[in-house]
């Protein structure tokens, strides 16, 4: 049994280091959509009568919904660090955003743990693994687990850095985040990231690709397009 396990392990490792071993059909394109601070009850298919999420509702209808799933951490960077490393928080050391001494010490129930702001360079990330298998990798939007996604396995990056939010009035161009060029004044960041992702997909449709679309919204500061603000302001409960 040990010999069989060793052979299987060796074949898996060997295969990952030889992308030519796989055909295109063996390497499906991957689009990972990550929405920051979205409540599970804020989706139409989960019962929301206030927020309108028709496209996500259609995704849920055509795909699979996990109703007993949990994030590996309660806030931004730790959850992302676990997602892209496959490690629990004690293993990668990113316990919170900034200092673990944040907040009022009188309400603290634990002794603050030593905290790392970003993933250590020695940690093998999901994008690095996919690159070794022949994927073209891209990040659009929030990264928050390192200063530059290109040092952690990303080939193309738009708007991703160590910043956790776009800053005051930062959802509209001119932007205050890194690695993004300002184009049309007043452009909405969520729309820009979506359009950049679509362009990348069309350009790389013939190659296996990994696209991490990580919107800064609905993370604070809450800044919506005027047309949508008007739509929601007319609803009951505002």
Whereabouts are the PLM-identified features?
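Sec-dependent N-terminal signal peptides
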Residues: 4-13
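Formylglycine-dependent sulfatase
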Residues: 2, 16-238
């Amino acid at each position: 049994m040990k010999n069989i396990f060793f052979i299987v392990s060796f074949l898996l490792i060997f295969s990952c280091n030889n992308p030519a071993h796989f055909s295109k059909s063996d390497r499906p394109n991957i689009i990972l959509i990550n929405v920051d601070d979205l409540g599970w009850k804020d989706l139409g298919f989960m019962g929301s009568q206030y927020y309108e999420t028709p496209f996500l509702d259609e995704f849920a209808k055509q795909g699979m919904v996990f109703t007993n799933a949990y994030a590996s951490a309660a806030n931004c960077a730790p959850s992302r660090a676990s997602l892209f490393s496959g490690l629990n928080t004690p293993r990668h050391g990113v316990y919170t955003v900034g200092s673990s001494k944040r907040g009022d010490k009188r309400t603290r129930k634990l002794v603050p743990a030593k905290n790392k702001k970003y993933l250590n360079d020695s940690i093998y990330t999901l994008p690095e693994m996919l690159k070794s298998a022949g994927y073209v990798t891209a990040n659009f939007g929030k990264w928050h687990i390192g200063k530059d996604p290109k040092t952690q396995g990303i080939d193309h990056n738009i708007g991703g850095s160590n910043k956790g939010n776009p800053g005051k009035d930062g959802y509209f161009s001119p932007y205050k985040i890194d690695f993004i060029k300002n184009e049309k004044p007043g452009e909405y960041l969520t729309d820009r990231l979506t359009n950049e992702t679509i362009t990348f997909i069309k350009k790389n449709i013939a190659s296996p690709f990994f696209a991490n679309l990580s919107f800064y919204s609905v993370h604070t500061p809450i800044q919506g397009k005027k047309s949508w603000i008007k739509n929601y302001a007319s609803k009951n409960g505002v």
